């Protein structure tokens, strides 16, 4: 499996039970993609190789999920995979129409105001504990964090790769002060 087609979403926290189940700590806590997952990849931190495993079953658990892989026969084998990085096919991180989007889907989109003026480019994401934040490189080369909340979002335009937001006046001025 190529890492470019895989997305790091968590790590194997520990073996779970006697039959080779794995407890995967998912960094975001969001596991809507788990039901569609047919394979996953594991990689040791000191390695470049991602080994592919076949999913037998999954179930939500704590801040992640329990996964049973066909290739992991028992607890001893599962313990040998503890602390490995957990990757999924990046196609699982694409929302369907009407679903909540994954933030990674709008990375590198332009941020525009309702008048269609480009305010910057979405270069990353952060959180203030209450809400997701878009990390935006503004047109003057500065960086601003913009709350990604329904009250500000007017449109997410996948065709033109733009997010249109009606932001409070002066938000960028406050960020860049």
From Swiss-Prot:
Domain PRC barrel: 98-171
Keyword annotations: Chaperone, Cytoplasm, Ribosome biogenesis, rRNA processing
Source superkingdom: Bacteria
GO molecular function: ribosome binding
Disulfide bond annotation, renumbered to this chain: none
Name of a matching Pfam family: RimM
SUPFAM superfamilies: PRC-barrel domain, Translation proteins
The protein's role, per its UniProt record: An accessory protein needed during the final step in the assembly of 30S ribosomal subunit, possibly for assembly of the head region. Essential for efficient processing of 16S rRNA. May be needed both before and after RbfA during the maturation of 16S rRNA. It has affinity for free ribosomal 30S subunits but not for 70S ribosomes.
Domain notes: The PRC barrel domain binds ribosomal protein uS19.
Subunit structure comment from the entry: Binds ribosomal protein uS19.
Identification of the protein by name: Ribosome maturation factor RimM
Native organism: Bdellovibrio bacteriovorus (strain ATCC 15356 / DSM 50701 / NCIMB 9529 / HD100)
Lineage, broadest ranks: Bacteria, Pseudomonadati, Bdellovibrionota, Bdellovibrionia, Bdellovibrionales
GN (gene name): rimM
């Amino acid at each position: 499996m190529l890492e470019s087609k895989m997305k790091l979403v968590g790590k194997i926290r520990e073996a779970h039970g006697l039959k080779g189940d794995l407890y995967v700590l998912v960094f975001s806590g969001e596991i809507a993609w788990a039901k569609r997952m047919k394979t996953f990849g594991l990689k040791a931190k000191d390695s470049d190789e991602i080994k592919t495993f076949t999913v037998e079953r999954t179930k939500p658990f704590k801040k992640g999920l329990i996964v049973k892989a066909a290739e992991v026969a028992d607890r001893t084998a599962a313990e040998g995979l503890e602390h490995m990085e957990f990757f999924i096919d990046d196609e699982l991180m694409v929302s369907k129409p009407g679903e909540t989007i994954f933030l990674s889907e709008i990375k590198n989109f332009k941020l525009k105001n309702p008048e269609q003026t480009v305010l910057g480019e979405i270069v990353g994401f952060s959180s203030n504990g209450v809400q997701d934040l878009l990390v935006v490189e503004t047109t003057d080369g500065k960086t601003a964090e913009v709350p990604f909340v329904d009250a500000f979002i007017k449109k997410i335009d996948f065709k033109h790769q733009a997010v249109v937001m009606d932001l409070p006046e002066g938000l960028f001025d406050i960020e860049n002060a």
